[in-house]
Amino acid sequence: MHSLSSALAGSTFVLLFLCLLASAQPLTTPNPARALPDALTGGSSIFSCPAASWPPTRIGSPNRPQRPSRELRSILSQISHKRIEASILKLVSFGTRHTLSTQTNATHGIGAARDWIASEFKRYADASDGRLSVDVIGYEQQPDGNRIPFPVRISDVVATLKGTEEPERIYLISGHYDSRVTDVNDYTSFAPGANDDASGVAVSLELARVMSQPHFPRPRATLVFAAVAGEEQGLYGSRFLAETYRNKSANIEGMFTNDIVGSSTADDGTRDPHVVRLFGQGLPPLTVEDQKQRETRLTIGGENDTPARQLSRFVKETAENEHTDMRVSVIYRLDRYLRGGDHRPFLEAGYPAARFTEPHENFAHQHQDVRVETDPKTGRKKQYGDLPEFCDFRYIARVGKVNAAALWSLANSPGMPRNVRVSTRDLSNDSKFFWDPPVGGNEGVGGYEIVWRSTVAPFWTHVLDVGMAREATVDLSKDNVIFGIRARGKNGERGVAVLPFPA
């Protein structure tokens, strides 16, 4: 009995090891165009796991990465690293953008930064033939006994590119324009915040500029480009923005924050210029899913198939190609240890959200007083501070392209199917599914697809087209794989998959 258990355990370990080895996504990729020839050229799927191909099936076909449309390729080609650099340098020029800094000086402090960001968005709006609208929204934050010692105005700058067919379906990106130094409440010292987070604001600005141009078709769904304040003091601006949308019952089907996306170089000098991390949360907060829903999710093994992780899978399928020249390293957790970001308030409001961050971080260039220190042992001098000289502007432009590929694909594909269920009324070796159309109905939907993967595979490996049906039975046991249902547009664009719950 002992030897049999050992053999089974060994076999299980070997299978799991081979699967993880086959599906591993290493962070270090000096040239992803060479490291990922299949994904970037449309060959065999990178989302497969050869060691996890059991159970065998003859139905469906391999799930392939989604290729960018002609319009998307044109958009990606116009994202400019020089404009991104100019935006970051301008934001740094305000001296400090600390949330508690002056809001009345025209050239210094967070108020000047806010007004400049709004003026840039408005300049793009003026050139957009009425497509882009700009709002500055905010509220008075009272002292919190911690990082807000006195009342302060928190302002978010929001540019909206309204969709043509489904304007009520929204996708949003943000960066935070406030900055800080070592002392989180020091609002007078020079706080350049080039990487954290002028880089993310520059991405929002550049995508708004490019996507709102009149010669591009407007997206089917609405895109929002935001710059928020108060992140360093407690995610205040993002929380206000998320609550504003939630109070309007807005249908936000995806949100991304770009926070610290300015450099590809680690503190030891390691460079990884073609990788960006994407953090996707597992179990939603209990304020979003109640205890019964959570217990059901855990019972069916759906903890890795939350809306945030489905959104992250979509990004990987749409944003890894030769036009972005990037690999998306999906990290299955909310955020880094001891850190937080502006996607969290959106998750807490019930919206799918994820965070983009550079592959390696140099903490000498984050949350630091600008200074030079000499190592007493080596005599070498070390520069501290979040200065623009440590930014890689071409890298930031590539991160912008990843965002653009995801946003444009999301906005031009159908929304997520609703009420996705799998029948559990009887014991059966097949799987029967039911679903309702997306919130916007079947307008623009060209069909539905059932996707699946091994329970140990990170990404969808198989797909089956079932046409316009709203129920389908698959000759594959729901006990052995993870399923999802997604809509496909008449334009061929595939949407985000949804995990079926028992019915």
From Swiss-Prot:
Coiled-coil ranges per UniProt: none
Known EC number: 3.4.-.-
Residues modified by glycosylation: 105, 247, 429
SUPFAM superfamilies xref list: Fibronectin type III, Zn-dependent exopeptidases
CC per GO annotation: extracellular region
Major localisation: secreted
Alphabetical GO biological process terms: proteolysis
Cofactor(s) for this UniProt protein: Zn(2+)
Positions that bind Zn(2+) 1: 176, 196, 259
Domain of life: Eukaryota
Keyword presence, Magnesium: no
Ranges where the Fibronectin type-III domain occurs: 416-503
Localization annotation: Secreted
Pfam families attached to this UniProt entry: Peptidase_M28
GO function terms (MF aspect): metal ion binding; metalloexopeptidase activity
Annotated Zn(2+) 2 binding sites: 196, 232
Cofactor: record remark: Binds 2 Zn(2+) ions per subunit.
Alphabetical UniProt keywords: Glycoprotein, Hydrolase, Metal-binding, Metalloprotease, Protease, Secreted, Signal, Zinc
Signal peptide interval: 1-24
Family: Belongs to the peptidase M28 family. M28B subfamily.
PANTHER family named in the record: METALLOPEPTIDASE M28 FAMILY MEMBER, PEPTIDASE M28 DOMAIN-CONTAINING PROTEIN
Name of the protein this chain belongs to: Probable zinc metalloprotease UREG_01421
Naturally occurring in which organism (per UniProt): Uncinocarpus reesii (strain UAMH 1704)
